[in-house]
């Protein structure tokens, strides 16, 4: 769990709190849920330096069918807030990668993205109809997927959120994508064919490699940390494989 100082005192953003609650609710539905120990220097990072205030707090878990369930909450200089979440499947199981990011500058949500990204060849065909059935018609400011975003499914949702109604609707989309993920994970059976497992490993490695091409992640962190620390954080905490 995130510390009380974050969830009850510092973190007052209602949208992020709603999304956090929803993600945790679905995470709790997974079998054999256990916390993962990570270097504490990378788990909770807080600075009160005037003009450079920041906190980053992470949650790491694993469960049946998932090698890593990661949630990150961050605030930079009191105006930039980020919620980042990736659920990486265990390659023995045919489960997609759940990813969600929200970027909020003051009261403006400049980026909101959620997807169930394929973690094996043709995997998306198994859930494409389910994702396409999620209503996304209310959003007015859809954003273009970057070139490195070929890792996403055809039903990746990426937009700026313009008002309270769109923020509520985004929470609903996330909820439905998570519900689909949980259903898929419940049906998944362990695979023992080494070639199939290796294919899934390669898909996750590529997912991480493509995500690391998103320069915006490092640009934010480099304002507060040196390049060595940033590279280690991205490769160890965010996109390890």
Curated annotation (Swiss-Prot):
Q: Which reaction does it catalyse?
A: (2R,3Z)-phycocyanobilin + 4 oxidized [2Fe-2S]-[ferredoxin] = biliverdin IXalpha + 4 reduced [2Fe-2S]-[ferredoxin] + 4 H(+)
Superkingdom to which the source organism belongs:
Bacteria
Q: List, in alphabetical order, the Gene Ontology terms for molecular function in this entry.
A: cobalt ion binding; phycocyanobilin:ferredoxin oxidoreductase activity
Q: Which InterPro entries match?
A: Ferredoxin-dep_bilin_Rdtase, Ferredoxin_bilin_OxRdtase
Q: What is its EC number?
A: 1.3.7.5
Establish whether keyword Repeat is in the entry: no
UniProt KW keywords? Oxidoreductase
GO annotation terms (biological process): phytochromobilin biosynthetic process
Q: Which family does it belong to?
A: Belongs to the HY2 family.
Role noted for this protein: Catalyzes the four-electron reduction of biliverdin IX-alpha (2-electron reduction at both the A and D rings); the reaction proceeds via an isolatable 2-electron intermediate, 181,182-dihydrobiliverdin.
> Which NCBIfam families does the entry link to?
PRK02816.1
PANTHER family, per database record: PHYTOCHROMOBILIN:FERREDOXIN OXIDOREDUCTASE, CHLOROPLASTIC (PTHR34557:SF1)
Entry protein name: Phycocyanobilin:ferredoxin oxidoreductase
Q: What is the lineage of its organism?
A: Bacteria, Bacillati, Cyanobacteriota, Cyanophyceae, Synechococcales
Q: Which gene encodes it?
A: pcyA
